Amino acid sequence: MNSETFSAGPKSAPAPATLTIASRESRLAMWQAEHVRDALRKLYPACDVKILGMTTRGDQILDRTLSKVGGKGLFVKELENALADGRADLAVHSLKDVPMALPDGFALAAIMAREDARDAFVSNDYASLDALPAGAVVGTSSLRREAMLRARYPHLNVLPLRGNLDTRLAKLDRGDYAAIILAAAGLKRLGLEARIRALIDVEDSLPAAGQGALGIEIAAHRSDVAQWLAPLHDPHTALAVEAERMVSRALGGSCEVPLAAHAVWRAGELYLTGRVSTTDGRRVLSAQACGAVMTAADALALGRAVSDELDAQGARDIVNALLAGSQVGKGDA
């Protein structure tokens, strides 16, 4: 149960002269990269911090859902290539879009303080999910949200929604959907909080592992970069996210599976909930655990406890069936 988060150790590296941040080119991704750039400039005023904007394969494929074309790795592969060949020193990601197991040679050097982890209901005509009439079209980009909608609102027509945040809002505004479900964090970061009609309680729509948090990835051998990024690391968020990602990793989860995991701190203990559903929402498994989490090993153990309980309820059967089905779909495409 190794942690995927880099430990920079006690030594300090000389202040950097230059740093290059790899980022997707969407407005939200660039905001996130600029947020990290500005933080680094404050830490290292003499450092020339640049952003290398890149278009990923995930940004190019807009006519199919992620679960049918290769998953979350489509958003990070090009950025990792830039880390590997030295064009970039670090890459900034929405952590929920990072595969649960990083490729060999890469590590998460810092996880920043989390924004709102909840899902947001966005609509021009309706105040909440409960207000939508039968047959109303709701757009979502994830199987996790789709399963939630089908379980709680079987009378709604749930359809895929691809594209970056601005594209999704444009599709709503032109009338393709009565409502869409988005991550609240992205809307808030771009100053679009006014578009949120309602925030969905985590009990009703448990967030994806890492939702609302930014992760900074590096090449694993770059201990110097890890040390420079250490001041941006938020330990409480990192431990929570480590536990969440362990739930998904232990069960073999991906964007091809409606799997959610969310941890919150209460009175010094970490409370972790995991949930696995069938895509039609007819079967929903849930498990919880809590404990005094002080180290990454503690967080991993908590995540393992929740995944073991879900496994005992039959979660792995759901995951394996969905993954087998997705592979058939890819072969037929």
Swiss-Prot record:
Keyword line: Porphyrin biosynthesis, Transferase
BP GO annotations: protoporphyrinogen IX biosynthetic process
GO cellular component: cytoplasm
Enzymatic reactions: 4 porphobilinogen + H2O = hydroxymethylbilane + 4 NH4(+)
Matches recorded under PROSITE patterns: PORPHOBILINOGEN_DEAM
Record-linked InterPro entries: HemC, Porphobilin_deaminase_cofac_BS, Porphobilin_deaminase_N, Porphobilinogen_deaminase_C, Porphobilinogen_deaminase_C_sf
Record Pfam families: Porphobil_deam, Porphobil_deamC
Cofactor binding note from Swiss-Prot or TrEMBL: Binds 1 dipyrromethane group covalently.
Pathway where it operates: Porphyrin-containing compound metabolism; protoporphyrin-IX biosynthesis; coproporphyrinogen-III from 5-aminolevulinate: step 2/4
Cofactor(s) this protein requires: dipyrromethane
GO MF, one example: hydroxymethylbilane synthase activity
UniProt modified residues of type S-(dipyrrolylmethanemethyl)cysteine: 255
The protein's Enzyme Commission number: 2.5.1.61
Catalytic EC class: transferase
Coiled-coil residue spans: none
Taxonomy, superkingdom: Bacteria
Oligomeric and partner information: Monomer.
Assigned protein family: Belongs to the HMBS family.
Note: The porphobilinogen subunits are added to the dipyrromethane group.
NCBIfam families named among the record's database cross-references: hemC
Protein role: Tetrapolymerization of the monopyrrole PBG into the hydroxymethylbilane pre-uroporphyrinogen in several discrete steps.
Record-given protein name: Porphobilinogen deaminase
Organism: Burkholderia vietnamiensis (strain G4 / LMG 22486) (Burkholderia cepacia (strain R1808))
